[in-house]
């Protein structure tokens, strides 16, 4: 029966899925039910008993794209699991591309200065709970994949994976997920990410000495080590080995390669493990960075982590639908009249928010420098 179900879904969704997801003013009853501040929230779209709410600043297309993705994801799972999610009356809040998380009435904060910068940078895609209601938060630039937004994976699919886990799993599935994750830790997979830091602090058009910039950015690290890493190929410029005299500008790509194993996000805990393999089931995950290895598709997952893939199959079946970037669906359905190059804004973090992000990653990678000290037999002070 499950095969018939998914064949019918595939054949029928073109007719039954809403070609245009209707964006309406937020109603008083919606505001009461979801406890939404009508001074801020003005627009709403409902799909699969999920309410998408935003300020007036967020585009209707962002509403429609979010609704489309939710609709396809809800159709791409076993009916009983989808029904449990519907009963939770999930709330989705979209942050406008020119809004901050701290402007959402539910997520205001007393943080100030750099702490506020970090909060607004880091918290643009997450799952929370307001009372017992699952509440997902996304940024418009990530859903629509504007320039400057996330274009390498769907944050929406990842976070909705958490909704599926938290709201859709029964006790038996929870226990099975625990056992599946314990198997991951036992056999040691999802520990093959890339131990390398992108260095992005150089913003000048004019070329400057990379060694000098590195010394300034990493004052705790040995200048001798920095020189050695440049000449030995541990610090690459545009993917190439260089030397201590190299000059770079804002357009050059600098990578500090620490080497060795690196824990993937999927091996962090059972919750993130599920969200990561859920993404892969729909062919949308980043590859070969600080949190990811090479696995990003369903076919790859089946070969790499067959037990995790079987869990996905038993929860989701084998739906034909896969995530496809809205940039590649221009001209179709609700994106019929959308011109990506003309209609999508470029999103750039303010300099102080960029600094907060760079500071975070400097701290994140700090312990990995020891690998380079050991490699080159240089004592770390």
How should these model regions be labeled?
Residues 4-13:
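Sec-dependent N-terminal signal peptides
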Residues 16-19:
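Boundary at the C-terminal end of the N-terminal hydrophobic targeting segment
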Residues 192-258:
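A basic, amphipathic helix-loop patch mediating RNA/tRNA/ribosome contacts
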Residues 166-195, 253, 259-286:
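Post-HExxH zinc-binding segment in Zn-dependent metallohydrolases
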Residues 21, 29, 37-40, 47-190, ...:
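Acidic/His-rich structured neighborhood in mature extracellular/periplasmic domains
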Residues 271, 276-381:
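Pan-zinc metallopeptidase signature
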Residues 54-57, 260-268, 295-301:
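Active-site rim elements
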